[in-house]
């Protein structure tokens, strides 16, 4: 119990940064949609990585790690969280990717925007920002989801890059955020054969993790990274939660793992191969 109280206290303490919230549903958006980058070839599977790069502070190291992964297994879509525009542009340039980046707030302590991004070897259409319910009482910060239609392998995929609230918010409110993501995915699923939802759901404790997974499963989304194990580390490695997930419709997972030798964040990149 004492460890639990300490963890919650530390999370609350470090989540009270001064932020300016971007409340407009249609701005600011940053995107690159270069047709010459896009891979028009058909394929039987999609390689995906979700990765929270901790306020985009170690971008050069993250890019080096991504390039090392690309040499072994080319990645078609990256879902990134805690990003700023400079970090997204550097990754896109370094790996030859198109991107959609939607900041949700300006972090006054870092003097940079922070938000979620989708990067891909395909093209991205129909960008949207889904603002999630409930503001954090400490600083009135809101969370949002970056959504776009990725066209790759002659397929159209509705893609979500998600970052929901920490335990600084009540469990019920955090589940409301999860419900909002699922509801939007359900509404749009009729227009898409393939839906991909991934990111950092801040499920620091197993009971809450089970609740999140059950919500997605009961609404027809498969947890494609169920066998990956821990995806993050905290308190000098004493706590190793499952925070990062890939859920989908229309795919079958053939391989998934966390890259635990990564040193560019307190989260591990989570990789999955999804067969169409």
Task: Go through each PLM region and give its residues.
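Active-site-proximal segments of metal-dependent phosphoesterases and phosphodiesterases across multiple
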Residues: 164-181, 203-217
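Sec-dependent signal peptide recognition
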Residues: 2-8
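Structured beta-strand-rich core segments of catalytic domains in phosphoester-bond hydrolases
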Residues: 21-33, 79-158, 162, 258-261
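N-terminal, active-site-proximal structural segment of metallo-dependent hydrolase catalytic domains
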Residues: 3, 14-94, 106-110
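N-terminal post-signal-peptidase region of extra-cytosolic proteins
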Residues: 60-66, 101-104, 134-135, 229-234
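Metal-dependent phosphoester-hydrolase catalytic domains
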Residues: 17-36, 186-195, 203-276
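Soluble or luminal CAZymes and related metallo-dependent hydrolases
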Residues: 58-62, 83, 140-142, 172-180, ...
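Active-site beta-strand/loop signature of hydrolases that rely on acidic residues for catalysis
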Residues: 46-52, 66-91, 119, 148, ...
